[in-house]
């Protein structure tokens, strides 16, 4: 049996999972507030639970990937997604909608970790290239999904049932791809190594540092997809123009991944991507207190995207180098769960800072937090990378 799947099928899977995921984020707040007549606070709590269950799905999926058939686990996740979304096709009132959304959160976290773990198993391609292209596929799925979800929602007369029907059909078709192309061998451990391989201390410290860095980065980054919409529209920018910022983000990521793949063939220091990315992410927030017009917000988004495209896919690639083949899934699950936790906590954290102080202090806090993450990562890498064992 083959030890890795064809790369194109892995990218297709990642793309489709993120198309499905992108149907949830843009509409949940509007649907819960306007159609289910709940408060914005309740909408925020529902999204918090959705991201929180992502953490559970990511962690559990990663642990199981190393022990059981990855194909069956992925197929099980797709079947569960079809069932939960199928319920929402016919019954999407309160409280069915938030309950099903929390269950879908588990499945989406599970499927994201499955794809990252499949990528971590690949030996025919460079790890940096694999994770850069996975990130590219993720974002392409998000851009495609968010582009079509608005018109579909309007066409369905503000009913989410048809949207979930589209997702059910898409996932059902994807299950056929998984059945045919996602079969890889389960790595059998020697009987005396049934327990998890003990990593060198330097490896463990670097993995936890990278995971913590991803949590903080996503906490700060998620301000853009949550609290920043209110801030930007409050400066006289329309919702259409705000949405255009995300189109710019998606197109830039597509272009940047091609440039990064070219750089990867000429540069052999992955850590530099993390340092550069953290610096750009921090700088993007430092621009915001001085932003007076739409052009400044576009500039900040461009700088943010430079940081995002270099730092965020680098972290799972670095972790992949630091863990053995038989534990790839577990550690990718940990990294994904930290990222999901950051996405869950970010909007709440930002809201509390804004409520207590204002937007300006939030921007400075985000700048300092991300630059601090870059500094701590640099110190830990300098301390441990020579003693670390690379797999």
Regions found by a protein language model. Give the residues of each.
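Juxtamembrane intracellular "pre-TM" segments in multi-pass secondary transporters
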Residues: 1-4, 182-213
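Helix-loop boundary and gating motifs at the non-cytosolic
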Residues: 2-51, 206-246
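Hydrophobic core of transmembrane alpha-helices in multi-pass small-molecule transporters
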Residues: 15, 95-111, 215, 296-310
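Structural signature of the two symmetry-related core transmembrane helices
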Residues: 72-87, 272-287
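Helix-to-loop junctions at the C-terminal end of transmembrane segments
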Residues: 57-69, 153, 256-269, 354
